[in-house]
């Protein structure tokens, strides 16, 4: 699943832990947990070739990148400047 963490503008990947009375509790791939309304979650739709933003080297700087590989929580991306990185889905987001 993808969830809008804290009602923000970006979608972050995670898994559903529970569903109750119009809410969904999601555990994000970075380990955070949150309970959201059903409108704040959507099916996971990331695929190779899709553009996302990733936290380059985990330093807190987010850059646009294209997905080059996906395997569970592992993701390969190439940034707009040509830099490549293998990272975790928990360090990426989509808009």
Where do the language-model regions lie?
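Eukaryotic chromatin- and chromosome-associated nuclear factors
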Residues: 1-95
